[in-house]
Amino acid sequence: MRQYFKTALLAGVLAAGSMVMSATADTVKIGFNVPLTGFAAADGQSALHGAELAVDQVNAAGGVNGSMLELVVYDDQASPKEAAPLAVKMITQDEVVAGVSGSYSGATRAAATIFAESKVPYISAYAIHPDITRAGDYVFRTSFMGEVQGRAGAKLIGEMLGKKRVTMVTINNDFGKSLATGFKEQAGNFGIEIVSEYEYSIKDREFGPVISKIKADKPDAIYASGYFFTAGPMVSQIRAAGLDQPVVGQEGYDSQKFIEIAGAASEGVMITTSLDRDSNVPETKDFIQGFAKKAGYPADMVAASAHTAILVLADALKASGSGDAAALRDAVAKTDLSASTGRISFNALGEVQKDVQVQIVKDGNWHHHSVISDPVLLAPPAE
């Protein structure tokens, strides 16, 4: 039944797809699926603010080839079941020229399939599952796939921090598994011994049993995947139990809300991510200032990544000079753009190639720790 539903959706898209990109208007519509309700709503709101800021900036500068950008927003609740029909609606009814996902991996994968089959460009802002770009050559990603970020975590712990005995705490979903895969792949190359790995559910907020096991492991460092709403309680409980080893996380922690939840326990926590709060790069500084003014709270990774994805499309729309989907897709593929999350370019699979930022909590805020710039280590797959 599920396959029939998917086939029916795609058939409807393909029947209408030939006319989607041919329309010309005073506005250019970009679809944006994002979780505005449900467990991921806080990330969704940040992503939406980031995307809206990018649209505002592009339009204030004159738009794209004389047309204004319009963001067509739908709440996908971070659910694949919601995202797939919304993708169809964006393409067939709203006639968007392209789409951006401001959502998590499950919803992004579902929408990516629809966009790819209908040959409409689609950019994943921050979802990390490796199969997203494999949906087709119309799909791109402006943040790191999970394996790449996991490799960076291994370099950070094993080489940069010099910690060799590591306990892993892995959230049991696509996000956590892909990060763990990358970390394990490179751990040995940086002299890391993985003492133990413990898994937990996205619904978990009490970590006593796991923390007792970590205590017994006596690791040099803890590599723990999660989101701000799981990592906050986890780190707070780790420190309350008297464990003072470095905790290294990833972009899922990248929110001021993590610091609010973990409180003083957040001090010293490090993450691999895409946004450098202390950057002197004009595009990053302007974004951080503009976001704080628009949203009323500090910028985070999901906001910066959504902002970047919209600017990539705006740049490609200018370069392609037409409403032709294939021309727009080719222009996205040739992107070479300085954005809030770094210099953006894509490989043959549509995966981003850029440095990894390392941030650390100091005095209740995220700050620059270091940059991992290693083209070989960070190279995403090309097929």
Model-derived features with residue positions:
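Extracytosolic ligand-binding ectodomains
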Residues: R2-A8, A25-E383
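C-terminal segment of classical bacterial N-terminal signal peptides
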Residues: L14-T24
